[in-house]
Every structure is written in structure tokens, then in C-alpha cells.
Amino acid sequence: MRSAISLSLLLVFLSRVQSDIVLTQPEADTGKPEGSLRLTCKTSGFSLGSYYMTWVRQVPGQGLEWLVSYHSSSYQYYAPEIKDRFTASKDTSNNIFALDMKSLKTEDTAMYYCAR
């Protein structure tokens, strides 16, 4: 039986209530162990290039785990446990904040959230 890594994604709205600012993610995606996967977060209502963006994840029944905060290629900070496997990036022309993941492990199974 082939095992899979389930990565669920949700819409994440900013903590500040501003109806014109939205972060949108696909509902769910699945990767295979040792495989790779790209998560995307479409942004609107603000200039993506002007802000730090963050990826966090949550394993069911546990708290949020910070993964990366990213402003630009010069200003990016990664959690040590994912530093060599995950890479964040911004496509400011298309307003997309992405997380490229490689060498997936079963412990990467979680809900992934982007946030500003």
C-alpha cells in the first residue's frame, strides 16, 4: 500500500479585520514521502513585496508550529527542522507567496497556513 502525506490548506484571514485584505489557499494537497510539493498563497489588498509573510503548520491536536518568516531573499528566517528542506518565495507580480517542500516526511502531515 502506498502511503501519502496529507497537507490540508485553509483560507487564512488577517488578524486585523480589514475586508479588503485576503489570503487565499487551495483546499488541500497531497505529497508522497520523499517527494516534493509546492504550497501557494494568493494575496490581495496589499503590496506583497512590502511585508513579511509567514508559513505555520498545525498537526491535529497540537499547537501552531512556526516554519518561516520571509520578506525577501535577503530577509528570510527558517525553523531549524525544515531549513534544508523547505524554501519560501514571493512572486510579487502575481501576488503569490509560496512554500516549496522537498524530501517530505510523514511528520510533515499537517494543516499549513500562510499569514501576513
Curated annotation (Swiss-Prot):
Region spans: Complementarity-determining-1: 50-54
GO biological process: one example: adaptive immune response
UniProt KW keywords: Adaptive immunity, Disulfide bond, Immunity, Immunoglobulin, Signal
Keyword Signal among UniProt keywords: yes
Region annotation Framework-2: where it falls in the sequence: 55-68
Region (Framework-1): 20-49
Location of region: Complementarity-determining-2: 69-84
Coiled-coil parts of chain: none
UniProt KW Signal keyword: yes
Disulfide bonds: C41-C114
Signal peptide from the UniProt entry: 1-19
Region (Framework-3): 85-116
An example Gene Ontology CC term for this record: immunoglobulin complex
Stored Pfam families: V-set
PANTHER family xref list: IMMUNOGLOBULIN HEAVY CHAIN (PTHR23266)
Record-given protein name: Ig heavy chain V region
